């Protein structure tokens, strides 16, 4: 584990885990050793040489467990190379991207002592069939179409750039 890179993620409906797994696969293709874990399961960062953290921006905020992870491990993360990603808009509209980028920048500014080697916002996935309480009770959300604007090529390119920065 001493030479491993940790990818820690928070997810509500599985989309961010899929992105974390893709990033891990790309880093492994570059010859790096990678562990992928939900942020809630990470007890220590001892033995990791770098950390990638990802979570969706959901209802205008990064998932709480991801923010808690950064807070809980703040001291260690300031000494390691860190990359951060977020999944954001589920519709490819310029206004949505602009607003979501502002939200992501606001989240990052809350952790001003962290200086990520990379921070990226990707499109997200929305599937009303996966909604859980209380969101599954909101009629407008239930009527929205399934949409997935995750750009797997962009995610792969970002992961390859991380291999150089974290490797």
Segments (PLM) and residue ranges:
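Glycine-rich NAD(P) Rossmann-fold beta1-alpha1 loop
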Residues: 11-17
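FMN-binding flavodoxin-like domain, especially the glycine-rich phosphate-binding loop
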Residues: 4, 18, 26-30, 35, ...
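Short loop/edge segments at beta-strand edges and connector loops
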Residues: 38
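Short amphipathic alpha-helix with an adjacent loop that forms part of the alpha/beta core around
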Residues: 41-47
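Hydrophobic ligand-binding cavity/cleft-lining segments
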Residues: 22
């Amino acid at each position: 584990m001493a030479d491993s890179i940790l990818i820690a993620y928070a997810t509500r409906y599985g989309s961010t885990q899929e992105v974390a797994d893709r990033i891990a696969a790309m880093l492994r293709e570059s010859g790096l050793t990678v562990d992928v874990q939900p942020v809630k399961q990470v007890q220590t960062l001892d033995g990791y040489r770098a950390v990638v953290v990802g979570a969706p921006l959901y209802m205008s905020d990064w998932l709480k467990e991801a923010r808690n992870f950064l807070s809980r491990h703040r001291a260690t993360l300031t000494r390691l190379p860190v990359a951060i990603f977020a999944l954001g808009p589920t519709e490819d509209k310029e206004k949505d991207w602009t607003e979501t980028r502002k939200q992501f920048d606001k989240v990052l500014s809350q952790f001003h002592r962290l200086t990520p080697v990379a921070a990226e916002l990707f499109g997200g996935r929305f599937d009303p069939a996966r909604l859980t309480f209380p969101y599954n009770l909101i009629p407008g959300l239930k009527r929205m179409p399934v949409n997935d604007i995750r750009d797997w090529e962009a995610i792969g390119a970002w992961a390859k750039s991380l291999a150089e920065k974290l490797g």
